[in-house]
Amino acid sequence: MYGGDEVSAIVVDLGSHTCKAGYAGEDAPKAVFPSVIGAVDGVEAMDVDVDSTKTNSNSEDSKTESEKEKSKRKLYVGSQAMSYRRDHMEVLSPIKDGIVSDWDLVDNIWEHAFKSCLMIDPTEHPMLLAEPPLNTQQQREKAAELMFEKYKVPALFMAKNPVLTSFATGRATSLVVDCGGGSTTISPVHDGYVLQKAVVSSPLGGEFLTDCLLKSLESKGIKIRPRYSFKRKEVRAGEFQVEDVDIPDTTESYKLFCQRMIVGDIKDSICRVPDTPYDDKSYSNIPTTSYELPDGQTLEIGADRFKVPDVMFNPSIVQTIPGMEKYAEMIPSVRGLPHMVMESINKCDVDIRRELYSSILLAGGTSSMQQLKERLEKDLIEESPHSARVKVLASGNTTERRFSVWIGGSILASLGSFQQMWFSKSEYEEHGASYIQRKCP
């Protein structure tokens, strides 16, 4: 047991798109930055920023080739560092399909959150980490090991994302529809526990929709120029001339990262889910909406602002978007949002199905898309059993939807009754990392 009431806990929610970190008890995270890392290989380990070289005493000879490579790469983390273009900088993501694939990068993201953003000493604060519902035991143990061995935290707790979203809205039982950056996951929560067998997920998240919109715009001959690739000169008052700047050493991954930032903003600003399933005929002469790109050109976007969001409900639309052919094999196996919700509920015990239908919670950055709540509710009312009273709940505040997992963690870690739940450093030293399975079921 850990008795650390006098210092506030730190809550970290590392998503596939954004990392959120801050103090328990506050109503929003202090640090919010992209959970990707810029890496420049072959930099001599002498000029180190947030370098992946750790202070190990092992000699150069005992290092493997890949370790030597890693020790020569320089890493850049955070919104500011990532917005600056560097030659040969690749953009790497440590998370694949919601699960951590590169712990070295995660370590650097945590370090940035603690040292540069929150400016705290991790040895003085208990840590609450949010984790995906399908996280493996091996992943949890690795996280515990890093937290206790490297950051030397006094106590740790790992809580599942859907449970925290449920707590954020003051419920113990609900069906959480988490539309994140990398995937969409539907998880039933009953009395504060996730029903693992009924969790349903799909790879269609916010980033997939952003890519659909990017490809669709490019197929119409619209060039999305990243901010570093042009200069604007004022010719006359209010009139600008745009000149391309040729930068040959920019990597493809960094160019795409910058384009996704711009297209992501277009998506958030003007896209909305259509009230009825999308088809080209009914939306061909829809009024357009304008959006000004950073280089000054104004886009007029018509049908695409409805077509792209409808991919969430009808994934087969992807096959009609030029440039998205590589997903052709994946798409037939992916189900639309209403079907995923029903599939998840049908995997649960009959006794709780009614309660789940009446408390469907929307969470995640993509859930803030206009009309998503209304369309999901409408489709579910049409397709669900008559006895079910469908109610889709979503906070009217987009910040609360986007940060619901973090907010739930902030509430949980500041509860007086929660303080005996922490997995303490002394318990870790006595029982080892595998004890996390007992402390945080």
UniProtKB/Swiss-Prot annotation:
Positions of the UniProt region annotated as Disordered: 48-73
Keywords: Chromatin regulator, Cytoplasm, Developmental protein, Nucleus
Protein task: Involved in several developmental processes including organization of plant organs, flowering time, anther development, flower senescence and fertility, probably by regulating the chromatin structure.
PANTHER family: ACTIN
UniProt xrefs under Pfam families: Actin (PF00022)
Assembly notes: Component of the SWR1 chromatin-remodeling complex and of the NuA4 histone acetyltransferase complex. Interacts with the SWI/SNF complex. Interacts with EAF1A and EAF1B.
Matches recorded under InterPro entries: Actin, ATPase_NBD
UniProt keyword Methyltransferase present: no
Biased composition (Basic and acidic residues): 60-70
Tissues and organs where the protein is expressed, per its UniProt entry: Mostly expressed in flowers, and, to a lower extent, in roots, seedlings, leaves and siliques (at protein level).
Keyword Transcription regulation applies: no
Protein name as annotated: Actin-related protein 4
Bilayer-spanning residue ranges: none
Main location: nucleus
Example of a GO biological process term: long-day photoperiodism, flowering
GO MF, one example: structural constituent of cytoskeleton
Induction note: Before cytokinesis.
GO cellular component annotations of the record: cytoplasm; Ino80 complex; nucleolus; nucleus; Swr1 complex
Record's subcellular location: Nucleus; Cytoplasm
Family to which the UniProt record says this protein belongs: Belongs to the actin family. ARP4 subfamily.
